[in-house]
């Protein structure tokens, strides 16, 4: 059955569906904003509809951190904006460096009124999975973060309760803290489980723990002998 909150939203016109970003180690970051449109009716964009972006220029928690702002006219369902953060501080796994996180907020404006908003955090880091041939039958793998090879010390993460709806943030925090204390720097989210609560991913960001995310149904009984299924 349904085990999470059920919410009913009443909107007059538009809302922000999703915000995601791409950032590089030189401080360039692009935010992509998906805005909901009602395509069942004539729904033209008015001149006073804009997106207001607010981005921190220093990591969260740093005193006297400034902010960068940009107003962009709404262009449709897909929108984007570019920012440059001078001298960005890079995110590292625990044991290799700090975990600076920057903040952002996106507001959908109708005139001067905030119709909808979304906010979150982001980081600057590069990730490479390098494949290095070591022989005819052996292929070596190396995980590289910000140009530095990382020795991965990991563990599986399975649903922590049979009834997932009763799990509280405090239990996530306790188990992740124990993993960090055990010198673990990566958790593999098991493909036979669930997509975990956002809190798990956010707290791992803070603690420097990387996530290896399996696709769900990875351990399902897939009918590999069914030609039509495989070809689909």
Region locations from a protein language model:
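Charged helix-capping and loop-helix junction motifs
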Residues: 170-171, 230-232
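Secreted/periplasmic carbohydrate-active enzymes, especially glycoside hydrolases
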Residues: 1-187, 195, 206
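Aromatic-lined substrate-binding rim segments of carbohydrate-active enzymes
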Residues: 177-179, 186-231
């Amino acid at each position: 059955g349904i085990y999470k909150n059920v919410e009913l939203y009443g909107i007059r016109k538009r809302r922000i569906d999703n915000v995601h970003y791409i950032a590089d180690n030189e401080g360039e970051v692009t935010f992509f904003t998906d805005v909901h449109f009602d395509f069942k009716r004539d729904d033209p964009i008015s001149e006073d509809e804009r997106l207001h972006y607010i981005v921190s220029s220093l990591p969260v928690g740093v005193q006297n951190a400034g902010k960068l702002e940009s107003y962009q006219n709404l262009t449709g369902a897909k929108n984007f904006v570019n920012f440059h953060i001078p001298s960005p501080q890079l995110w590292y796994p625990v044991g290799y460096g700090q975990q600076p996180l920057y903040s952002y907020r996106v507001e959908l404006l109708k005139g001067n009124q905030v119709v909808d908003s979304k906010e979150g955090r982001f980081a600057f880091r590069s990730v490479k999975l390098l494949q290095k041939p070591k022989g005819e039958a052996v292929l070596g793998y190396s995980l590289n973060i910000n140009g530095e090879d990382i020795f991965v010390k990991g563990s599986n993460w399975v649903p922590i309760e049979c009834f997932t709806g009763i799990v509280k943030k405090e239990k996530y925090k306790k188990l992740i803290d124990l993993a960090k204390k055990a010198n673990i720097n990566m958790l593999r989210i098991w493909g036979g489980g669930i997509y975990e609560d956002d809190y798990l991913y956010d707290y791992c960001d803070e603690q420097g723990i990387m996530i290896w995310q399996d696709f769900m149904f990875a351990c399902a009984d897939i009918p590999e002998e069914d030609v039509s299924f495989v070809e689909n």
